[in-house]
């Protein structure tokens, strides 16, 4: 037996449970550390199988695929650690039974982000590599804030990589950085509630919870568990950033006035370090509350026993940029911009390069994305609006009357929060998918016309008939897409294609 075989035999056996993108990344990382692997999936041909087989020699991996509705009894034999895919629901069969067995056997259960945190700790010891880490979570806006934060940081002169839920997986990005000898100064991590459930040692320099609305209740069980999963990232963070308009995120910090807390919101900021919006002379501005120019830092007084903790002071408001100068549309995206700026500002970067980058940022695909205008009607692709909160934000943020296209797989959500915003902002609603009728039933009290469409082509055509000049036709389904489409990007692509087809039929060429 050679040295490599000896080290693998001595290393603990790791079970990779679920072979999606994060499972492949975790398997590659564990194999890189010399761990023998066992890979299990309920599917016979999981999506990540080809990628893993290409990356690793078969001899290092034992595959247990096609497990179906029950994992085999001997799956945990010899296993020291389970890396759990965020796509597996812990309280549903067959995952629930396997995790119960793992607890009985004292087998550690972690996720890919936890392995990433431990990898950074190891690199700090072996290479003295200590990057800054910024973490972003929330129901809606995570990908936009993550991508924008990375761009703001790079504009400020620091190297950065974005990874996590945004793709690539964090460990895949780390492997690439190591192989390219291109470790960044800053990691910007988009983290889902699923990922946070299995993360324990990640301690970001700054973390933000953007918002919390109903989503993934089929995975977490209830809103309390969902919010608690999101809140996990704030406690270990050196700087906690929350949305002060959202009571659920405010409740995650001890006090909005605390020295290690920052907030953003729709109102004018009052405490140093906070950001917000201000309406002045008919123009909405992105604003920041900053220290008064002549304030000198006072020496920190010795804190008396039982004295209240020190708090942040008020400051002066600085107007940074008109909201209309942003290319990303809607108030919700203005708030996303504020969150990204606060994260970048936590690295002591200046406003100038940030604002120039922010002005040019066009947003991410399928997120309040303008497809085109036809006959003075804007057609907007917000296919990523897979939950009620996202659709509420899109309707409130656009600032124009809307014909809404909504529906799909509702995931057990309560659709009633749509009622007041549809009443205020929607001229009509076109319903699609298996839960379209359920949404229509909930919206009956609004008095807003609701019509059904069999497919996206009919939905776009019906919406075009209902829209008036100056309106927007908004695809923001408030639902998952899998009843009619491969995924939400496919849904958005079909919508965009139908909009372009409509333009051709009307003789309008882009």
Swiss-Prot record:
The keyword Nucleotide-binding applies. It comes from Bordetella bronchiseptica (strain ATCC BAA-588 / NCTC 13252 / RB50) (Alcaligenes bronchisepticus). It holds the Pfam family Mur_ligase_M. It is found in: Cytoplasm. Residues 294-316 are annotated as: Disordered. One of its GO terms (biological process) is regulation of cell shape. NCBIfam families: murD (TIGR01087). HAMAP family: MurD. Coiled coil: none annotated. One of its GO terms (cellular component) is cytoplasm. The keyword Ion transport does not apply. This is UDP-N-acetylmuramoylalanine--D-glutamate ligase.
